[in-house]
Curated annotation (Swiss-Prot):
Source domain of life: Bacteria
SUPFAM superfamilies for this protein: Adenine nucleotide alpha hydrolases-like, PheT/TilS domain
Subcellular location, record wording: Cytoplasm
Keywords associated with the record: ATP-binding, Cytoplasm, Ligase, Nucleotide-binding, tRNA processing
Designated name of the protein: tRNA(Ile)-lysidine synthase
SMART domains: TilS_C
Keyword Zinc-finger: no
């Protein structure tokens, strides 16, 4: 179908963004997005991520900068380092890109990030997740719209095919670059795009739309499941721990889903299926206090009486030896406290704090973004607790 510029603009404006951020590679997809939004009366920032892999990467960066200068669009270029040894470059680079986008978004009141993923990308993502053996959440692939702690992500081209986008670019004489590394089948997505999808199209000429529809069904089912699990989790959890007797009173499949969901909600990390199975099996074998299971270098799950608890291996128990932290706290905290009762630890994904002068608590990640604390500085944060309540986040702020 033909790309509907008016409809896409309407979908963007429905979210009333203060600023538009575009992930701009110079390729046809993001170039079409830039063309569609360039005349909107909304401040727009195009971000080019230089992966430092292709020999033409700097030339593409200059191309993007020239296009933006000519259209009076703000332009930011960000360069990535090499991926850590042993890590998948695709996964690492994807996280690095999103982290940088979020850092820029945190500077504005209600920004929206536009990404140029299209229907064929969605079909490829579905296959990648299926090959990995992903569950519903993974098979849901890429969401059309996602609310972030600060701003939102929108993929306005997700219902359009690559051909629809190329036709629009041709009709509107849009200048864009072509990345020949997209032909390199050493990358899984390129292998699927260039070799597997053509074979599947022989079976079903509309395979991209079919797989994209399957991803949408999985997304809807996953959303329903998450809501049901959240409701159940509230009933069988206490202070981020699971009440074992309550958990074991449920259907076994629900038990496993809740263990996986509880860990993800608490740590912002996912258990592997094998880990979930092992924890579930141990719980049903009448384990007792003292049982421990290492998830990774950071987290450990243990049993204490009737509770399943997540321990952070990076956690520091006592604050007594942290003189700098004590002095910092004494200067800012307006209540008396016994240093022997204080605990300092690394922050966790579920941590919340009621910032001074506010009526309700927010997740620390939200506060970091609102206070414009750079991503590079957030790793320094230490959570200070008194009587199991967060009273401060060193060296940034005090909580009410």
């Amino acid at each position: 179908m033909s790309l509907d510029k008016t409809q896409i603009i309407s979908q963007i404006l429905n979210h009333s963004p203060s600023h538009i951020i575009i992930g701009y590679s110079g390729g046809v997809d993001s170039s079409v997005l830039l063309d569609i939004t360039k005349d909107l009366d909304i401040p727009t920032i195009a971000i080019y991520i230089n992966h430092n892999i292709h020999p033409d990467a700097l030339k593409w960066q200059l191309h993007c900068q020239t296009i933006c200068n000519n259209a009076n669009i703000d332009f930011i270029a960000h360069s990535l380092d090499q991926a850590p040894k042993g890590e998948s470059f695709e996964a690492w680079a994807s996280k690095q890109r999103m982290d940088f986008f979020i850092e820029i978004m945190s500077q504005y009141s209600s920004p929206i990030l536009l990404l140029g993923h299209h229907l064929d990308d969605q079909a490829e993502t579905f296959l990648i997740q299926a090959i990995r053996g992903s569950g519903l959440a993974g098979l849901a692939s890429m969401p059309y719209y996602k609310q972030l702690n600060h701003g939102a992500v929108l993929r306005p081209l997700l219902d359009y095919t690559k051909k629809d986008i190329q036709d629009y670019a041709s009709q509107n004489k849009i200048n864009h670059i072509y990345d020949d590394s997209n032909e390199n089948i050493k990358y899984r997505r390129n292998l699927i795009r260039n070799q597997i999808m053509p074979i599947l199209e022989q079976i079903n000429p509309n395979i991209s739309r079919t797989l994209s529809r399957s991803a949408k069904i999985c997304a809807e089912s996953s959303n329903i499941l998450q809501k049901l699990l959240n409701e159940k989790l509230q009933k069988i959890s206490q202070n981020n721990s699971l009440i074992i007797s309550e958990l074991l009173s449920l259907d076994k499949d629900i038990q496993k889903s809740l263990i996986h969901h509880w860990f993800k909600e608490t740590t912002n990390q996912s258990l592997k299926n094998k880990q979930t199975e092992e924890i579930h099996k141990a719980l049903n074998n009448d384990i007792h206090t003292g049982w421990q299971f290492d998830i990774n270098q950071q987290f450990q799950i243990s049993v204490e009486y009737n509770q399943l608890i997540i321990k952070n291996n990076n956690q520091v128990d006592l604050i007594l030896d942290n003189k700098d932290i004590i002095e910092w706290l004494k200067e800012r905290f307006n209540k008396d406290f016994d240093t022997r009762e204080l605990i300092v630890r690394q922050r966790q994904a579920s941590d919340k704090c009621r910032y001074q002068g506010r009526d309700k608590a927010n997740k620390l990640k939200v506060l970091f973004q609102e206070l414009k604390i750079p991503t590079s500085e957030r790793s320094k944060a230490k959570v200070i607790l008194l009587n199991d309540k967060i009273i401060a986040v060193y060296p940034f702020f005090i909580c009410d």
